[in-house]
Regions:
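Short coil/turn segments at beta-strand junctions that form active-site/ligand-binding loops
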Residues: 207
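Short, well-ordered alpha-helical segments in soluble proteins
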Residues: 89, 93, 176-177, 203, ...
């Protein structure tokens, strides 16, 4: 009986969803990315998105401040962690988006994160003047939040107070050469470890990966459903360099952008398996419960 209780305590929603998702092999994903996405063509397209850590609170929290086009990359409210992660993801592959955040220069063509004329009018009417990088980053989050809330369940919208569901985040996520799909993660299983290995393979290939985090179903359903979104960053970016790569030298690791505090953390891949305690890189949640894995765009 004790073993049953223990299993229930660490059950996560991904355990219930994982039979619905196809298996993932990290080696297969790495080969497909290397062959079909051609990461080398992305070289030089990754913008300068991180500055060296300087704030005392960032050092105390063990992270490095993340910046995008001069804006501190912090989610604008309690429901926009997914929006901030998706803007950061898009900026990693789009220098024109970074330039707009930095100085307001309009991209040559429309971007899903940049408000159109009507959107700018609405922002001004609500008191948000796009006068500096921080406000433009906030505005981009608002635009993305609106997009991910539309048509979430057929034609029905998603309540904005409930954040960003994984399937609309996968629909909205954009990075050159790939699209994204939802892969549930149970970090106590070989299948979950394979998904996390696939995340590592993607970041090694230069592709960022959004991660959904949460707690244990044993503490109640509200702790097990996806509660927060972070972003595994491409290895070799300035975010990665500024972090110092401090986790277990030589061991596979991820550099994770955590939007609630706007910090990046380096985490050993092994430390994401069979977790029982909160982790700052996961927004102080204990588990990765889903990943938006990249696949070569059709």
């Amino acid at each position: 009986m004790a073993s049953i209780r223990e299993s229930w305590r660490y059950l996560t929603l991904s355990t219930l969803l994982s039979p619905l998702a196809p298996p993932t092999r990290a080696g297969d994903l790495a080969r497909r990315l290397a062959t079909d996405v051609l990461p080398e063509r992305l070289a030089g397209r990754l913008p300068d998105t991180a500055h060296a850590a300087s704030a005392h609170d960032a050092r105390a929290l063990g992270g490095t401040p993340a910046r995008i086009g001069g804006a501190r990359a912090v989610q604008r409210d309690a429901t926009t962690c997914g929006s901030a992660a998706l803007v950061h993801l898009a900026a990693l592959g789009d220098p024109e988006l970074v330039r707009w955040i930095e100085d307001g220069t309009a991209p040559a063509s429309p971007r899903p994160e940049v408000p159109d004329v009507a959107g700018r009018v609405d922002l001004v009417a609500s008191g948000m003047e796009l006068t500096d990088p921080d406000r433009r980053f906030d505005a981009a989050q608002r635009v993305v939040k609106s997009a991910t809330s539309r048509r979430a369940i057929g034609p029905v919208g998603w309540p904005e107070g409930l954040g960003t569901p994984p399937w609309t985040a996968a629909r909205q996520a954009r990075f050159p050469g790939v699209s994204y799909r939802v892969a549930p993660v149970d970090d106590r299983t070989a299948r979950g470890a394979a998904v996390l290995a696939a995340v590592h393979a993607a970041t090694t290939a230069g592709i960022p990966v959004p991660l959904y985090t949460s707690g244990d179903l044993g503490r109640g359903l509200r702790f097990a459903v996806p509660r927060h979104v972070v972003l595994a960053l491409p290895q070799g970016t300035d975010d990665d360099a500024a972090s110092g790569r401090s986790a277990r030298p030589g061991a596979p690791s991820l550099t994770i952008y955590e939007p609630s505090r706007g910090l990046t953390h380096v985490v050993a891949l092994a430390d994401l398996l069979a977790r029982t305690s909160p982790l700052k890189a996961l927004g102080s949640w204990s588990h990765v419960v889903a990943a938006l894995l990249p696949r070569p765009a059709a």
